[in-house]
């Protein structure tokens, strides 16, 4: 992936070494969000087709492996921005989904980014459900400035 070429240049860590280290860490530390896991299990019970869309630089096979290891099981299709050379952020990935999955279908997109997952999904005819991510949800509980603590250490 192109990102590892930049990281190699900036850090001196070889592309393959960096990629393998990241994938190992992803495999070790990624786990299923219990609420999203419950939702995917419920959707599967209804027999609905479920696809993954992601603005991510990892390969589809890596994302597939991470999700399966985390307990989500297999999805029906994967649309990963770096493989389609377009993104949810710009809206083009939603167009690819419609082209491949069928323009006449109804889609519900669940995501944690208001711009990419909600606004762009709606612009492209998808129903959209916002799932607040942990960083946004935790923001009110984080101090604005922790620099005073640095003087204690």
Which residue ranges define each predicted feature?
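Conserved Lys-Pro-Asp/Glu-containing loop-to-beta segment of HAD-superfamily phosphomonoesterases
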Residues: 89-115
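A short acidic, often aromatic-flanked loop/helix-cap motif at beta-alpha or helix-coil junctions
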Residues: 39, 84-88, 136-138
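Catalytic cores of eukaryotic secretory-pathway lumenal/extracellular enzymes that build
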Residues: 80, 84-87, 115
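Short, acidic loop-to-helix structural element flanking the phosphoryl-transfer center
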Residues: 2-52
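Charged, amphipathic alpha-helical linkers/stalks
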Residues: 142-153
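Acidic, Mg2+-coordinating phosphoryl-transfer loop and its flanking beta/alpha structural elements
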Residues: 108-110, 115-143
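A generic "structured core" feature
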Residues: 11, 27-34, 61, 70, ...
């Amino acid at each position: 992936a192109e990102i590892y070429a930049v990281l190699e240049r900036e850090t001196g860590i070889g592309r393959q070494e960096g990629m393998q280290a990241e994938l190992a860490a992803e495999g070790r530390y990624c786990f299923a969000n219990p609420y999203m896991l419950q939702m995917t299990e419920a959707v599967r019970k209804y027999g609905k087709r479920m696809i993954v869309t992601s603005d991510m630089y990892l390969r589809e096979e890596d994302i597939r492996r991470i999700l399966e290891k985390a307990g989500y099981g297999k999805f029906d299709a994967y649309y990963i921005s770096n493989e389609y050379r377009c993104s949810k952020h710009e809206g083009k990935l939603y167009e690819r989904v419609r082209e491949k999955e069928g323009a006449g279908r109804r889609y519900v997109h669940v995501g944690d980014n208001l711009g990419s997952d909600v606004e762009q999904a709606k612009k492209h005819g998808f129903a959209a459900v916002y799932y607040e991510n942990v960083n946004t949800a935790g923001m009110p509980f984080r101090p604005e400035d922790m620099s005073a603590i640095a003087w204690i250490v």
